[in-house]
């Protein structure tokens, strides 16, 4: 029989053993290192015992007898092989007869597919065969007894191997040095011992050198030269022939099958081979019964392995020799038997068992054959091996491609000839190892893989892929084995695998960093590394395996997977790793794919392995498919409907220079075309989202929504994808590549390196689904996308991506975005493509698959909480944020924490202060964006993620590019509103608690009126003038920004505004259209400027103007009420409709105006109620749009809740009251408080932080100026006390009023604070009305309780302006009282003095010359207009009293006031004129901006209807048609306002000239007096203060 003996035994004089050798071996299995089997076998004479067999064998298998080399013997093969080798195929597959060195030859053979089947044995077999077996082996007649015994021994050996593998380090050392000499002796156990030389010669095994391999200097033992020339008929070859080839006339009876070889090949990953080398040697030795020798060899081998490792990867042969033992079919069989694992008849069967689909098996077989051929070639020449390595690389690539569709690990092994070869050995070893200790081998293999990957990492992904493929194959084998093998083995393997994985990852990372030529590494790794490195790795892995408790980082991922549902951990992660094209890391993971993971990868949790085994969701092919995106379509058990090849979308982001938020550019937009300085207002592709207030998530989601439909219809909601992309979050539940893609995209994809995704994205990003900061997910993004998914199956991939993202420095704080996939760090680069093709593809496919799987596995994955909980929604960002990204482009975003988190924090009082500090204040939305897009870095709570995702989906559904603000608001707000509303509520509550009306974050000085003061003022005064406004008096944003924002606001309100309130629009009592949009505007106000939002086109300004105007002035021209707020009004560029003042396009100005409205007097009750009671009606030149300030405030607060809470809650309808000459003062009821809320909540006011915010308290919030002498009824907050009762007192100077005086809402929400008796007086006065041209100015009774309270942020000293305003109001109130008492002359003088004071205040509100005054002159414009009306009233009174000189001065003041107002309206008027020219060309219903005009028309129609319905007595009612037309054409309205101011100024000039002429003719005041008057009339309007000084001098000269 054949027996394997060590030279040591020979030295010891151990004789040839007969059948008793089996028993000896049996004993050997239990022997410790250094111990030898009993020598009784030496006395067995095979010639005598088996003499009759020799002839038979010679006759039947003569040419094969020489194949019984190395560790392979009849004994080893056992009875199943027939004991005699009689079942071997008639034709032999001879490995190349010559190898460079015996070790090399051994290695080559082990690499050969032949050896792969008996992976474990082949390694040892090589070692043994090399030294002892010659080409011409004598006939071998193994005894059946011996073989059976041998099998027993092998099983025991296997057991020992498992135990010994724990101590592989020592064993490997001994195995390295202890080489087996294969001796074939024929004879019975009892037969006389034959001379060794005779036996060898008879068998053709003439080997002169008795020295053992272990004696070789290299520690691997040198093979005899004969061995080098050993033909392909090595034991390994024989085993392969037995298993793989049929005997002529029929198939082999051998139990071994082709699949066995393939199986071993599967198991063979180099790491396994390496591990196997050490383990296999031990096992082989056990098999042969030379435990002692094996031990020795192992001890030496360990050293040798290290030496080899250090020496050269080329010394594969030596290592392979060691490996041969196990690789031999006998060894493999033994291993299987020891494990009680039925030999796999077919890899497919195995796969079926594993649950994995081994469609690759046929391919494997072919590959295996090819492998065999290649192996032979390698055997012939190591050089050829190197060449083959190259071939293998190509093949590996092919295998990967094939495997992607569904080829099994076999294909991989086939692809990599060497790898397969090694894999075969490794597989055999794995089997042995499984027998002995799969974990050890697995860990070893892992280590080998690590080592290979390390060397190969530098090289190329192909190496990794090849290794991966091998690994995958190996996992398949290991998996099947693992199933059979005890869980402990799996656990050990897993642990080892984890260790090896972590090491491999580290090594791979290092290698990646140090990447060298891929081809070299491939060759070296496959060839040289396979044996030496493998051994080393085995040793390492064994040592590691011996410390399974030590789990590598990689393990953590697997651990996560372990916790994940079984099906989930596999393909996805691998796919992510592999598919991601993360060459090095993925190869490891790939190799560890389900099968490997299951059996080979200790890193993989048992559960994971078992799940793969049980669920078999991912076959290696499946994993490969996952790895290979193109092949994703390959049918896999897990595969959801085949995903279309991921569409690689180059995602570009642009960063706003103002808000630093990232905006996803349309996929085909070239970022290079963008201007250097880019602002959110330039975001024209999303009509309603071109505001800084809009969060990144919103814009990303909206944009992605446009591209969602293209997403594969896998049943995955496009919204979900885009949302996921936006958030950068992926559902870990789905194992599909889509999930990977999704994750990858998460970030915030947003990943700077292009690995978006996550979000974040990466995101996934991750934030949640877009959590912008997910986000990041997203995108996060987020980077992770920094989100690690709780779900284990995704955890690996996710971790991998996260690592990548992190390594790639995904900046998603959120995720990707920021919280955004695009973090602040990304700010430096405005435009960047966040996602790479690979990531996009993988993300997309993974995302889709995940969705599909989620749907399919609703039972398992349906739990959205699970997905979210698992962190599948990475981005977060990723959403996206990674940033939120659509399947194609959105990311991150991934991984992104829910926007609400940021928003919440922003809403904090500290945030308020921050806003005040920061010139630019971002609304919670913006913050939310950051949060959402933090896709990346920040993980929102899962619940928050879920919510965000849902919201995002909703927003997506609604996010169709909003045509109008309303629609947008409804859409985006639906998603964000919840979080934002909550945030706003919290903020609001905080603000209310703090009683801070609002903090305007103004780049300029901000004076916040305390709500207490405001309330006191309100309580004390109805008069608007007395209450300070909280307004941003600072410069408004540049007009370009404003205009762009305004245009955008039309659609913009959607996301940010909606977030705060969707219902608000409905809530406002004022015209629903305008109100809703107003809310949007207010929301914008909170974010940008509420006014703009009202109408996308400039007309929207009119609404804001109303607010601001009302706030600023009692329409009557008692501008004082809001004069404190004038600056804030100034910010409101919008012109009051009355005054035809347009709000400046800039949102800031609009915001400022609204804050002003909100800033109107707020009583404590207001604070308590949080009710801004606003009577809003601006009669600008008779055009009055009344809009409830409450609505504005509500909008500003950004909440429906912000609607007035108390009885005041009844919103004053936008009553456009036109008191004939009576301008109702807008009562800004606790607007200020509301505004404060707005500011804190939204940046509506703050957003215009650039402008200094003046907090003016409108005590009564309204001042009444009789337009053209008409007293305005003032509405007290608690009451709508004053209606323009003096309609009879329509201005006789109606002509002076081109349009009705500013409208005031007659209706004012009741204010809890009692009105002062003055209010009643005022009411009485109003009732009386002035008969004269200037009816009494409706004077709000409230006296300013405290000048300090009324301080307003004026560019000049706030206090001085406040005092001046207070004095003007006091004078006006006093004049009203005197007029009621019938003292007309005194009252007229006081009115005039009051008008002069108002002019002074208006002049102080003018922006400095250095500043673009046209942007900030709303307050001044409004005050000038109202003052002009008051002056006109005074002039009319003087004319009646025949004081023509005084009348001339009054009219001069009217002229100056109107000219000043027109002066500041001119820039807008000029544009409007141009627009009107175009409009004239267009059909009446159309305007240059259709969307804006639509909204404006809607709002304007409602507004125009409001005035007519509310004040039927108003002269404007008659002008309704005109008003409607004007409203429909905001440009026309503004132009008319401008024209009206100019006309009024010229009319006043004419009147003054007539008056002075009349005075001169009458010579009533003497020459000096007339001269002074003449001087005044000749004075220009530029220097108001100088003019006022001259007027006072003239008044004294004329004794008036």
From Swiss-Prot:
Record's compositionally biased regions (Low complexity) = 896-908
In the record's own words, the domains note is: The CW-type zinc finger domain is not required for nuclear localization.
> Which GO biological-process labels does this protein carry?
positive regulation of DNA-templated transcription; regulation of seed growth
Where would I find the CW-type zinc fingers in this protein? 647-700
The free-text tissue note of the record is: Highly expressed in young panicles. Highly expressed in axillary buds. Expressed in leaf sheaths, flag leaves, nodes and internodes. Expressed in roots, culms, leaf sheaths and leaf blades.
Which residue stretches does the UniProt record annotate as biased composition, category Acidic residues? 25-38
Predominant place of localization = nucleus
Q: Where is the composition biased (Basic and acidic residues)?
A: 1-12, 146-160, 431-455, 498-509, 557-575, 585-626, 791-804, 834-855, 909-956, 977-996, 1188-1203, 1241-1251, 1277-1292
What are the entry keywords?
Activator, Metal-binding, Nucleus, Transcription, Transcription regulation, Zinc, Zinc-finger
Record-given protein name:
Cysteine-tryptophan domain-containing zinc finger protein 7
Additional info? Plants silencing CWZF7 exhibit defective development of awns in grains.
- Write down the InterPro entries for this protein, in alphabetical order: CWZF3/5/7, THD_CWZF3/5/7, Znf_CW
Keyword Cell membrane included in the entry's annotation: no
- Report the gene knockout effect: Reduced plant size and grain size.
How does this chain assemble? Interacts with TBP2, a subunit of the transcription initiation factor TFIID.
